[in-house]
Amino acid sequence: MEQYTANSNSSTEQIVVQAGQIQQQQQGGVTAVQLQTEAQVASASGQQVQTLQVVQGQPLMVQVSGGQLITSTGQPIMVQAVPGGQGQTIMQVPVSGTQGLQQIQLVPPGQIQIQGGQAVQVQGQQGQTQQIIIQQPQTAVTAGQTQTQQQIAVQGQQVAQTAEGQTIVYQPVNADGTILQQGMITIPAASLAGAQIVQTGANTNTTSSGQGTVTVTLPVAGNVVNSGGMVMMVPGAGSVPAIQRIPLPGAEMLEEEPLYVNAKQYHRILKRRQARAKLEAEGKIPKERRKYLHESRHRHAMARKRGEGGRFFSPKEKDSPHMQDPNQADEEAMTQIIRVS
């Protein structure tokens, strides 16, 4: 392994990665430094040392095998390659304002774990490059209290950020090497304020930890979209959406309302419904209504001739010649033609 060293004025950041050449690329104000094989310099301790220089005020991107690491710092970064157990690559990043180092371990399957902070597990296909974005903690003063936030994003995976600055990470993980993929969404409890309903699938497990986060495990893969405080699952290729947020039904959705009535009629209908429900509960009237009240009246109504829209003719309209049924007039005309012929 090789050791890459760069000194900084105030603090020193240490990241353990694999050796490589130094290539700088300018992409949207971010300096990309790729480590590959290059000329080496021997230090006094006998180790091989190389220096990485970065322009002040620009973040540094160090490409690691299988992923990329971005830190928002303008100081030169010290990269040291140290062999880990079982062929692992260990990366240690000190966080300003806190004590200790954040250690990121890259194992061959692609799992990434941050000790003392958030944990991210990445399972990607072979040949695909995963990108890990780690920003320095941003200190925000709210109501006299200092809060430290850190955003971790994985390119190629699914990440969403809430309006409060919290990060929702969707982590697809293979289960026992099978084709079935399960995803885990970590949602801060602060972003779940208000009356909300989370509709999940049959195999969805929802747990709540003591750290103020809610974890939802899904049996499918998809994208997490955060729009206006709403959490949705956008289906990917060949997948079915498993989680969505639906509004709570109001009082008007629980009871069917009659249409096209005024306020007086509406209140009267409600009173009749309450009175009928009370009588049905007491057993005084049957719960099922008959189709018609009197059979004789029903037969008479069915035998009566109706006009347009099912309206009954009045006796005067029925006797008038211009209100005669057109079908009956056609039948009489055909009868006259037959008689003449």
UniProtKB/Swiss-Prot annotation:
Q: Which residues bind DNA?
A: 290-315
Supply the InterPro entries for this chain.
Answer: CCAAT-binding_factor_CS (IPR018362), NFYA (IPR001289)
| UniProt cross-references to Gene3D superfamilies, sorted A to Z | 6.10.250.2430
What SMART domains would the database entry show?
CBF (SM00521)
Q: Which residues in this protein are found as Phosphoserine?
A: S320
Q: Which Pfam families match?
A: CBFB_NFYA
Family from the record = Belongs to the NFYA/HAP2 subunit family.
Q: Provide the protein name.
A: Nuclear transcription factor Y subunit alpha
